[in-house]
Regions:
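Short, small-residue-biased leader/transition segments that mark boundaries at the very start
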Residues: 1-7
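Cationic, amphipathic, low-complexity alpha-helical segments enriched
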Residues: 8-9, 13-17, 23
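Short, Lys/Arg-enriched N-terminal segments with co-localized hydrophobic residues
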Residues: 30-42
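N-terminal amphipathic/basic leader segments beginning at the initiator methionine
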Residues: 39-71
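A glycine/threonine-rich phosphate-anchoring loop and its flanking beta-alpha core
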Residues: 155-190
Length: 190
């Protein structure tokens, strides 16, 4: 199972279909109209508050260690995807910044698009074993989403997949920082 499948299961496809229904000339079937009406009835009111500090600019990755230290992290999981962060030297700069700030870390790479649950489970176990209290995701949306899933899995008992299937509500999550490598991810602010 991939975490990208969660989007499809939890309304992404329905939301997309709902948007298509507003296209002039698009015809809705009776079944589509009933589904949309039922979804509207089931909507829940909510407040959304998600403060996010964004540090932007050339060379800001060199501040990673200091920024993580501001969050009072005592041990960090550096979570990343493909070899591009290694080849570019970015991962080494992150490691150096953490070392200069005196913050111990462990690493877990190998995130692929639509992250695999097996890697999330591996990350959860690594974080628990190493007493990690902060996750630093270095990459794009899939790395960030995988890091979030690991954060929820560490902070809550049971199977992290239950949260994605809405069987349980998460009580917390490890703090997560991001060194974003792609401008279009969007995952970094939620």
């Amino acid at each position: 199972r991939g975490l990208g499948d969660v989007y499809k299961r939890q309304g992404g496809i329905k939301s997309h279909q709902r948007n298509d229904d507003h296209v002039p000339g698009a015809e809705k079937t009776g079944a589509q109209s009933e589904i949309i009406e039922q979804e509207i009835k089931e909507m829940t009111n909510f407040d959304y508050y998600a403060p996010t500090k964004v540090v932007f600019g050339k060379g800001t990755e060199d501040q990673a260690g200091d920024l993580v230290r501001e969050q009072r992290a005592t041990k960090v999981l550096v979570h990343y995807g493909s070899g591009s962060v290694k080849r570019s030297g970015l991962l080494d700069r992150i490691y150096q910044s953490l070392e200069q700030a005196g913050i111990p870390f462990v690493s877990l790479g190998g995130v692929v698009p639509n992250p695999r649950l097996s890697l999330v489970y591996q990350g959860i176990e690594l974080c628990k074993k190493e007493h990690v209290d902060f996750i630093l995701a270095v990459g794009g949306g899939s790395v960030i989403d995988s890091g979030k899933a690991i954060g929820y899995g560490v902070a809550n008992e049971g199977d992290v997949w239950d949260f994605y299937e809405r069987k349980r509500v998460a009580a917390g999550c490890l703090p997560i920082g991001v060194v974003l490598t792609i401008a279009a991810a969007g995952s970094e602010t939620v």
